[in-house]
Amino acid sequence: LPVAFLKFAIVLILFIAMSAMIEAQCIGNGGRCNENVGPPYCCSGFCLRQPGQGYGYCKNR
């Protein structure tokens, strides 16, 4: 196999692994969240919190 192909394959594998790690650091819909505390944030980008509650739940807008 050509060296260029092996380099490309290694970079591709690293990119896929990093993408999976970044995605795993967010909270899925239905999970508890607190936008005031910081990461991890909701994957959807929206944390629904009722007034008076210390936490909310991730959901789509």
Curated annotation (Swiss-Prot):
It comes from the Eukaryota. Three disulfide bonds are present. InterPro entries: Antimicrobial_C6_CS (IPR013006), Gurmarin/antifun_pep (IPR009101), Gurmarin/antimicrobial_peptd (IPR024206). It is found in: Secreted. SUPFAM superfamilies: Gurmarin-like. The keyword Signal applies. One of its GO terms (cellular component) is extracellular region. Residues 1-24 form the signal peptide. The modification Pyrrolidone carboxylic acid is found at residue 25. Disulfide bonds join 26-43, 33-47, 42-58. Found only in seeds. The keyword 4Fe-4S does not apply. GO terms for biological process: defense response to bacterium; defense response to fungus; killing of cells of another organism. Its main location: secreted. It holds the Pfam family Antifungal_pept. Homodimer. Possesses antifungal activity and is also active on two tested Gram-positive bacteria but is non-toxic for Gram-negative bacteria and cultured human cells. The presence of a 'disulfide through disulfide knot' structurally defines this protein as a knottin. This is Antimicrobial peptide 1. The gene is AMP1.
